[in-house]
Amino acid sequence: MAWSPQQDDALAAVAAWLRRRDTQVFRLFGYAGTGKTTLARHLAEGVDGDVIFGAFTGKAASVLRAKGCPGAATLHSLIYRARESEGESPTFVLNRESPAAKAALIVIDECSMVDEELGRDLLSFGTPVLVLGDPAQLPPVKGGGFFTDAEPDVMLTEVHRQARDNPIIRMSMAVREGESLPHGTYGESRIIGKRDIDAETVMRADQVLVGLNRTRRAYNNRIRNLMGFRDAMPAAGEKLVCLRNNKQKGLLNGGTWLVKEFATSRSKKKVVTMRVQSEEDARHVVKVSVPQEFFDGREER
C-alpha cells in the first residue's frame, strides 16, 4: 500500500517506539479519515507476538472488526472476568490471566472514552499500548480522557482522498474549519432547520442528541408521552444510559442498557431498583438501584 509522507513518518515513529520500549503508551492521534486504524492494522502485522484490538464500546469494537482488526472486543471483556456472587448478578474483577497479560501489543481505538480507573487497570498488565484518538471528537460528559491528557506522539492531519468522498467526513472537515453547513442531504444524513423538527421526525429516530440537559428532559418527557408512558420512572423495554462506572457490576459510563424488569420503587429511600440488560451483550443482565431524582428531573437540583 502506498503511504503518504505523513503516514510514513507515523509508521516509523511507532516502529521505533516498539523497538525502544522506553514508554508503555504511544499516542497516535488524527482526524477522521487520516488512516489511524489502517496504520495500526499494518503495524500489528509486523509485531512478533499477539496483538489485541480493543475499544470502549461494543459498537466501536465491531467497527474495528469490520476494518480488518481480528478479534476486536470491548476493553471490559478483555481485562475483566465475571465472578460468582451471592447476589442475583455476577461481579466483575480484573482478570490477571487475560490475553492482555501475554500480548505483545494492545491497540485501543477511541481512547478519549477511557477513564482513569479503566486506564490504570489496562496499564497494570505492563503490555505496550498504542492508543488511537481524534482530538476533534467530543469527549464524554463525565469521565474519560485518561489517555488524552498528554500531547500526541504523532498527529495525523491529512485526510486521504478516499475518505473525502464520505459525506460525514466532509461535513466534519467543514465544521472543524469553522464553516456552516447549509440545509440539505449529505449521503444518508440530512441537515434541517429547527422549525422542521416535528413529532413524526423525532419518533422515527433511534436516538435524539441534544446540547443541554433541560432540552434532554423536555424531549424525553414529550417522547415518553407520545409512546404512552405516564409514569416518570422507567418501564420495561426503555433504553437507559449509564452515567457512572461500576466495575463490579460491569457498568461503564456511556454504555446503553434496556430495562428488563422494574422491580420496586422504595419511597422512603427514594431509590428505584430494576434489572437491566446490556445492549451490546444480551447475556449481561444486572440488578441496579438508582436514585429517583435521575428520572424525575431533579438530579441537578
Q: What would you call each of these model-derived segments?
A:
Residues G54-K102:
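Inter-Walker segment of RecA-like/P-loop motor cores
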Residues L39, L43:
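Hydrophobic positions on the alpha1 helix immediately C-terminal to the Walker A/P-loop
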Residues W3-P5, A10-K36, R120-T127, L132-D296:
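Conserved helicase motor core of P-loop NTPases
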Residues D109-E110, G133:
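Walker B catalytic acidic pair
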Residues E45-F53:
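Post-Walker A helix-loop "phosphate-sensing" segment adjacent to the P-loop in P-loop NTPases
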Residues P70, L105-I106, L130:
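Hydrophobic "anchor" residues on beta-strands that sit immediately upstream
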Residues V51, A104, D206:
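Conserved acidic residues
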Residues I79, M113-E116, L138-P139:
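Catalytic P-loop NTPase motifs of RecA-like helicase/translocase cores
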